[in-house]
Amino acid sequence: MSERYPIIAITGSSGAGTTSVTRTFENIFCREGVKSVVIEGDSFHRYDRAEMKVKMAEAERTGNMNFSHFGAENNLFGDLESLFRSYAESGTGMRRRYLHSTEEAAPFGQQPGTFTAWEPLPADTDLLFYEGLHGGVVTDEVNVAQYPNLLIGVVPVINLEWIQKLWRDKKQRGYSTEAVTDTILRRMPDYVNYICPQFSRTHVNFQRVPCVDTSNPFISREIPAPDESMVVIRFANPKGIDFQYLLSMIHDSFMSRANTIVVPGGKMELAMQLIFTPFVLRMMERRKRAAL
């Protein structure tokens, strides 16, 4: 953990809603004049889309039905740890991009589902911002979680997470319900072993809880609206958190535990702005002092 070269990491499963959290931080950075370098977790997958299909078919032929993007064998955990370590020490490192779509791939003259070449991080950034699956991962070989100054978990209750993944993969990526369901089942062991443990290492967790029936996520026709849910916000260390201020600023919020505040789903972005803007400002103040 470095004061001069701070790191913020957003970690969550596929369909958890990490992208919306990233947009909130982008707004904070823009408003406060913070120059960030963004790292997408997908860029640390070991295989591109075509390679992954081949490797998955090979795994299935050998009886491995749980070959997934969530586990260690299909990700460059060592490279991710090296990036975090290098940035924390000197503000440098190497990154690449994963090109999800034709629109993303066109400027690079590549096919969707491929990686760009590795390149150095831009110089003179104020912080590194990571969004992906493994911002807090720890294994016998690596400890990524030790580097972020602020580690945030985004983890809806499981049925809501599945509804969001089903909706996204069907509407935006053209998959069938059966294909998405197979993916969820295949990933389950790695979800339990690699994704869930990270949320015990985070500094703050955001868990959206629907107030409507999501008993069978595989037949749900739409994602519950923000106003049809509540968000549970848990702080690992509540010291210094002004809960009275948050309660006064966020209508219908309440404390459920000494380190937990619950807010209406439609107020999640406001809550993030109120909670994380002071965090970012303190980071920048410490960064200035560390540079003296």
From Swiss-Prot:
UniProt binding sites for ATP: 12-20
Pathway note: Carbohydrate biosynthesis; Calvin cycle
Record flagged with keyword Nucleotide-binding: yes
InterPro entries: P-loop_NTPase, PRK, PRK/URK
Molecular-function annotations in GO: ATP binding; phosphoribulokinase activity
GO biological process, one term: reductive pentose-phosphate cycle
Record key words, sorted: ATP-binding, Calvin cycle, Kinase, Nucleotide-binding, Plasmid, Transferase
SUPFAM superfamilies for the chain: P-loop containing nucleoside triphosphate hydrolases
Keyword Transferase included in the entry's annotation: yes
Subunit composition and interactions: Homooctamer.
Listed name of the protein: Phosphoribulokinase, plasmid
Organism: Cupriavidus necator (strain ATCC 17699 / DSM 428 / KCTC 22496 / NCIMB 10442 / H16 / Stanier 337) (Ralstonia eutropha)
